[in-house]
């Protein structure tokens, strides 16, 4: 099986206010407070889709900030019909949808495979977060697919690309 990865970019000059916010945000040790403050910030500070490069037929990842404590934030610009692999995350993951529509299929680990448990649709202004086991990368196993061209902000407690990949 060939696994195609998204294209990753570092930062964006028009998003300095986001980096300043994130630098302060990541000094907070409580993931739930991080989620609350991020929702509040993003409702007050519009982030346009056009600020981030597309990468058809998948999605692009623009790293907005990486902190010394390993927290990172990135923007994902999804092409319509883009689908991620089934993957896990570090201890904490937070997604906030700014534009478009995303379908998130949730899975549970079963050996080296994943078993689907739920599917949810997210629209602009909606978010979800996951809190799992520290020092593992198989938390919050899911697959994301874009029903429309979309833009989402993601915050992780470590490098999301370390997430374990699963098959069904």
Question: Which residue ranges define each predicted feature?
Answer:
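Short glycine/proline-enriched turns and hinge-like loops at secondary-structure junctions
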Residues: 87-90, 146
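Glycine- and acidic-residue-biased ligand/ion/polar-headgroup-sensing regions
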Residues: 90-109
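Short acidic-glycine-tyrosine-enriched beta hairpin
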Residues: 106-142
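Conserved short histidine dyad/triad with adjacent acidic residue
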Residues: 74-88, 122, 133-135
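N-terminal leader/capping segments at the start of a protein or of a new domain
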Residues: 1-47
């Amino acid at each position: 099986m060939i696994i195609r990865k998204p294209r990753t970019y570092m930062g964006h000059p028009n998003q300095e206010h986001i980096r300043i916010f994130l630098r302060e945000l990541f000094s907070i040790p409580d993931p739930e407070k991080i989620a609350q403050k991020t929702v509040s910030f993003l409702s007050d500070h519009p982030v346009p889709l056009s600020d981030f490069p597309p990468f058809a037929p998948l999605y692009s990842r623009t790293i907005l900030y990486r902190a010394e404590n390993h927290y990172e934030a990135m923007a994902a610009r999804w092409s319509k019909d883009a689908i991620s692999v089934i993957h896990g995350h570090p201890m904490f993951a937070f997604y906030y949808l700014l534009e478009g529509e995303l379908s998130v299929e949730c899975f549970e680990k079963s050996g080296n495979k994943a078993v689907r448990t739920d599917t949810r649709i997210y629209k602009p202004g909606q978010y979800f977060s996951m809190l799992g086991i520290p020092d593992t990368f198989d938390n919050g196993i899911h697959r994301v697919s874009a029903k429309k061209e979309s833009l989402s902000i993601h915050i992780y407690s470590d490098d999301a690309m370390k997430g374990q990949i699963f098959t069904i």
